[in-house]
Amino acid sequence: MKKRWIALLLAAVLPIGVLAGCGSEDMPELSLDSITAPVAARNEMEVRTALGNYTGISEAAPDSADGEMATVQFAGDASATTALHDGYIYVLSNSELRILRAAGASTTQLNTLDISSGTSSEDSYEFANALLVEGDRLAVVTTASSMDSDLSGSDVCHLRLYDISEPSTPTLLRTFSQDGLYEGIGTANGLLLLVSSGTADLDEASGSAASMPQIGDNAESEAVPAAQFYLSSVLDAPTFSIVSAISLADAQRSGVRAFTGTIDHVCVSEQGVFLARSIRMESHGDAYKKDHYSVTNHAINAATELLRLTADADLTMLASKPLAGEVAAWELNAQANALYVVRSLS
């Protein structure tokens, strides 16, 4: 079916889109009403159980790590594997950070730093995700992926925050980690916001998550507190997302928020942290006879759930709205106080 591309202007309240029915009396209806706002988790077991129980509405799982360098564009900043700041060029290549001085048409390499987490081996590797420069702070993001003997894997997103008051010799202030693959990064209100999505390990006997997703600070790690989790109404894989707020001034994790389900797009501004996830909606009609055959109509459509959090240490959820179609691209225009979303409808 031919796709139509639609540009949609969303005000800060994120108005709801409408998903049309399937147009046949025998065809089951698909409604956005099945997508309700995430609810706060009451305890750890509720989170672990939610990760093990699925609703039958499919959600895209995070992409497998492929070792390639990522380039991500978000509101107001450019996050990539190369950053230019005050005549200095920072280049991130896998686990190596090179610092060059640009003068006219020539460049001089000044320094090379090993920024690996020390997890690389025959069964694991680390690859570059993003660089971000904000004032005298440099954020370096990598993902470490590993494969266990039973062919199960794990991914951990690492953030290293440097002081670049002396650009050629960055000083490491602190390292942070959070389970999952890197999804996006941005800065607002003196904070660095980092988003990752991953897959939880499941205990097959109990049907619940064997462990809670972890966050780390230097060498210490802990489970994401259940009080910081929101449970999605639509989940068809044991997936989760973590949003961390890190203070650029004192290099401390100021807050964390987590969701069941993955995040596909990230936009950050002073107006909020905007997250989008794709949802594949399916529905089956009742079986009926036609030409001596038993027929069951099957409807499939795509939807997107938009979430808006405060861009502060609390990361409070302000709004959740479902939209028909999949988000292809978006841009946050802070001056117009609006979010522009391009989505595709089948």
Where are the model-predicted features located?
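Intrinsically disordered regions, especially transient/low-confidence alpha-helical propensity segments
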Residues: 1-2, 19, 159
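Hydrophobic core
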Residues: 14-18
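Bacterial N-terminal signal peptides that target proteins for export
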Residues: 1-9
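Beta-sheet-rich non-transmembrane sensory/scaffold domains
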Residues: 22-346
